[in-house]
């Protein structure tokens, strides 16, 4: 820019006032002298203006672009006239940031795509993110001469493949520098490219004042909706932008890779933006020009105008402006061009350009912006049947469909004691209700087997016992899981229904038999613990006691060789009466064995204590652990109610206690026996006078062992009958009592189970500590006593 000498306008000096009389002449001349203005260029030799020219990054045509946009009358000698410190600073700046070598352009016959493998962060919340990371990649800009199309941004041949972008940093200090480190060989080597500061200028001014038409910030080539306003947010100068340009390596071919990261240097420190440790990667894909369909239906003439070579006399700015003008025209759509082209079932590649699909690959291939037509997939009908088909029945014409077949769980036989749990009580005379009919399919086989066993007698009793052994084990597991959830009223009702059903069965059998000739010889041979044993936690009701008493008397009448005796005046004499008669079970050689009355255990383990050949649920599966037979014994006596005054009145008899002794095999010496006393409400009991017990052959099956008080498994090999206190039977009775007996404290009358011996020691220590420290808190008046008490209790319980 040529400078001209300043032209000073002529000054008209006003007429000096006439000096007053008596004033000196020198002061008058000083007041009239004109003022003189001195400029820096004339006085000091400094220029009035400085002009700097920046070379754009457009490659070989950068000089023409600069000349077309910012040429003046004397632009050629601008650098020559720039002398002094400013000229030296410009030379140092050019040396510090040398221009990158011009990249090798792609041949004019083809074009290329730039495929980034990362996603940019959204503009929303950018200021908050910059407060944490200090620097981030804001946008990737299309290369010069890019053509937007349906398959992405395509660059025609003859253009150098470069990557351009914007970096946003937090303005922490005035002195700052941004560099982009790029690598073409997987970080074997790298090069740092400086990023240039982008001033806050309106859109379209470009970078460095290149003027309108520079595609760096043009929304038509690379910046999506809202990206333009996000590029220059009104953040009050809190952030700054830097622009960079990265060339690909010389001779880059299809699949060339460019990795880069951003470094932000400030006096406070150095910060990096590396895509969360994964680096930023851009791939180069060589591809021909897009078709009108791929270019969103652009007319063929516009495509040819965009792809035709530019004349040499035409500058890049005019060429880019022409392309932008054609791209900004409204898109014309034709109906026949929007018709979707069907794909073949065997070939998934594009019908128009199969080579493009193969070169781009399935992952990095450019995806079209318009939606593809909805494809309808026909699924053959599948017939679902309840019965699973065989492998050979699957039709080969249809593809196999994987259906997961859920097999039904095996039906669990619900026991009569648990069929109506939680239901309202019903009258026995009204017959079976709906719940009994619903469960009939599960209970009918069991009832038929029971009736068949009653009719068959003792000859076919053993097979029926084996058929019923598997049911009680499953039933007890179900009952054990539900008894904790039931209340006392519900259990009373179920127990009453059990008694009524069992008593009605006994009455029906007695009525059908017509006497002792057809009555069953061994009632307990077909009865299981399902009918006779319940885990009863509460007291019995009056009706239940009466029903249990009647059932007991029924079994007492059926016994062979059993005679009820009258109780003596002496209650301590348990083994004899006034008539001197006792209940004597008949020998198995002479007739059927004696029938023992059923016991209903409360709060104890399920154990059947009978005499003679009786089926025991836990005995027939314990042969794997114990080889000796199982013998069960009872101790008690029938006594007469003094109020009745009749020796034969059996309704006044009540079961007092049943003592079950469990000992191990006879071959083991020094074994311990566990005794359980189960008291009831009355004091009368059964007293057998037999001197020997008959062993019971058990079946070879497995069964869960009975648990002792400490949780250990106790193998129930034999149960012995203890001593009889009567003097008449003392000499002839068989003493099966074990020599050693574990100490068992006397349990209170209300408790059904005795306390374990292992708990007496800790309980005694705990009571002693409580008695000794009851007055310590009052005496010490502090929290130390409580701590001592807690420690003592912990040592007592967990030692």
Swiss-Prot record:
Tissue/organ expression: Highly expressed in brain (at protein level).
InterPro entries tied to this protein: CBM21_dom, CBM21_dom_sf, PP1_regulatory_subunit_3
Disulfide bond positions: none
GO cellular component: membrane
Compositional bias ranges of the Low complexity kind: 20-30, 585-594
Extracellular side: 794-799
Membrane topology summary: Single-pass membrane protein
Compartment(s) where it occurs, according to its Swiss-Prot or TrEMBL record: Membrane
Keyword Transmembrane helix (UniProt): yes
Keyword Transcription: no
Alphabetical keyword list: Membrane, Phosphoprotein, Transmembrane, Transmembrane helix
Cytoplasmic domain ranges by topology: 1-772
Positions of region (Disordered): 1-30, 53-108, 201-235, 332-353, 417-439, 566-600, 663-688, 722-743
Annotated Pro residues bias: 7-19
Source superkingdom: Eukaryota
Residues recorded with modification Phosphoserine: 18, 545, 587, 592
Residue interval(s) of motif PP1-binding motif: 36-39
Any one of the GO BP annotations: regulation of glycogen biosynthetic process
Transmembrane segments: 773-793
Compositional bias annotation for Acidic residues: 78-97, 569-579
GO molecular function per UniProt: glycogen binding; protein phosphatase binding
Primary location: membrane
Function: Glycogen-targeting subunit for protein phosphatase 1 (PP1).
Listed PANTHER family: PROTEIN PHOSPHATASE 1 REGULATORY SUBUNIT, PROTEIN PHOSPHATASE 1 REGULATORY SUBUNIT 3F
Descriptive protein name: Protein phosphatase 1 regulatory subunit 3F
Protein source organism: Mus musculus (Mouse)
Lineage per the UniProt record: Eukaryota, Metazoa, Chordata, Craniata, Vertebrata
Gene: Ppp1r3f
């Amino acid at each position: 820019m040529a400078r001209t000498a300043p032209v000073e306008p002529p000054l008209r000096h006003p007429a000096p006032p006439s000096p007053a009389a008596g004033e000196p002449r020198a002061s008058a001349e000083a007041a009239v002298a004109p003022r003189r203005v001195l400029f820096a260029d004339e006085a000091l030799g400094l220029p009035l203006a400085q002009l700097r020219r920046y070379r754009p990054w457009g490659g070989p045509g950068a000089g023409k672009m600069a000349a077309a946009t910012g040429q003046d009358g004397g632009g050629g000698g601008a650098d020559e006239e720039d002398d002094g410190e400013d000229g030296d600073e410009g030379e140092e700046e050019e040396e510090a940031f040398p221009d990158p070598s011009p990249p090798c352009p792609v041949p004019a016959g083809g074009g290329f795509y730039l495929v980034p493998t990362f996603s940019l962060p959204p503009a929303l919340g950018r200021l908050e993110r910059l407060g944490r990371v200090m620097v981030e990649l804001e946008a990737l800009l299309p290369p010069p001469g890019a053509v937007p199309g349906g398959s992405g941004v395509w660059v025609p041949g003859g253009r150098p493949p470069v990557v351009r972008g914007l970096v946003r940093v937090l303005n922490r200090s005035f002195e700052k520098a941004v560099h982009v480190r790029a690598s073409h060989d997987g970080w074997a080597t790298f090069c740092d490219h400086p990023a240039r500061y982008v001033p806050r200028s309106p859109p379209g001014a470009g970078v460095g004042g290149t003027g309108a038409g520079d595609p760096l910030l043009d929304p038509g080539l690379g910046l999506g909706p809202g990206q333009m306003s996000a590029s220059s947010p009104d953040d009050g100068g809190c952030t700054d932008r830097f622009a960079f340009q990265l060339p690909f390596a010389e001779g880059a071919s299809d699949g060339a890779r460019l990795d880069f990261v951003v470094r932000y240097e400030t006096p406070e420190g150095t910060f990096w933006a590396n895509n969360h440790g994964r680096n930023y990667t851009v791939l180069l894909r060589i591809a021909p020009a897009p078709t009108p369909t791929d270019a969103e239906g652009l007319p063929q003439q516009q495509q040819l105008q965009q792809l035709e070579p530019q004349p040499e006399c035409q500058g890049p700015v005019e060429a880019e402006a022409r392309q932008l003008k054609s791209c900004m025209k409204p898109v014309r759509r034709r109906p026949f061009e929007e018709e979707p082209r069907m794909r073949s079932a065997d070939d998934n590649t594009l019908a128009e350009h199969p080579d493009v699909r193969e070169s781009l690959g399935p992952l990095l291939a450019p995806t079209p912006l318009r939606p593809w037509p909805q494809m309808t997939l026909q699924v053959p009908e599948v017939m679902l049947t309840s019965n699973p088909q065989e492998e050979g029945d699957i039709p080969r014409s249809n593809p196999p469909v994987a259906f997961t077949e859920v097999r039904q769980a095996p039906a669990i036989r619900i026991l009569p004691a648990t069929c109506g749990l939680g239901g309202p009580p019903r009258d026995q005379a009204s017959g079976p209700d709906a719940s009994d009919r619903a469960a009939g399919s599960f209970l009918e086989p069991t009832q038929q087997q029971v009736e068949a066993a009653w009719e068959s007698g003792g000859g076919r009793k053993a097979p029926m016992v084996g058929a019923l052994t598997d049911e009680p084990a499953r039933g007890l597991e179900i009952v054990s899981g539900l008894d904790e959830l039931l209340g006392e009223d519900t259990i009373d009702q179920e127990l009453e229904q059990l008694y009524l059903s069992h008593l009605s069965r006994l009455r029906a059998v007695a009525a059908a038999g017509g006497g002792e000739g057809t009555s069953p010889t061994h009632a307990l041979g077909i009865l299981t613990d399902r009918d006779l044993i319940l885990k009863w936690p509460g007291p019995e009701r009056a009706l239940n006691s009466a029903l249990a008493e009647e059932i007991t008397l029924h079994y007492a009448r059926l016994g062979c060789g059993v005679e009820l005796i009258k109780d003596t005046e002496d209650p301590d004499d348990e083994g004899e009466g006034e008539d001197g008669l006792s209940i004597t079970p008949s020998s198995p050689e002479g007739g059927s064995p004696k029938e023992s009355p059923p016991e209903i255990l409360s709060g104890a383990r399920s154990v059947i204590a009978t005499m003679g050949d009786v089926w025991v649920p836990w005995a027939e599966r314990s042969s794997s652990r114990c080889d000796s037979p199982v013998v069960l014994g009872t101790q008690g006596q029938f006594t007469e109610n003094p109020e009745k005054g009749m020796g034969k009145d059996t309704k006044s008899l009540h079961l007092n206690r049943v003592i079950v002794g469990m000992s191990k095999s006879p071959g083991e010496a020094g074994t311990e026996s566990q005794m359980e006393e189960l008291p009831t409400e009355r004091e009368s009991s059964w007293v057998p006078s037999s001197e020997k017990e008959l062993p019971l052959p058990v079946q070879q099956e497995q069964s869960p062992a009975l648990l002792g008080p400490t949780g250990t498994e106790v193998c129930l090999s034999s149960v012995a009958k203890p001593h009889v206190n009567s003097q008449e039977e003392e000499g002839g009775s068989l003493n099966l009592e074990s020599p050693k007996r574990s100490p068992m404290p006397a349990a209170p009358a209300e408790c059904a189970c005795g306390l374990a011996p292992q708990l007496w020691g800790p309980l005694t220590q705990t009571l002693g500590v409580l008695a000794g420290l009851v007055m310590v808190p009052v005496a010490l008046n502090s929290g130390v006593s409580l701590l001592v008490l807690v420690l003592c209790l912990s040592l007592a319980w967990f030692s």
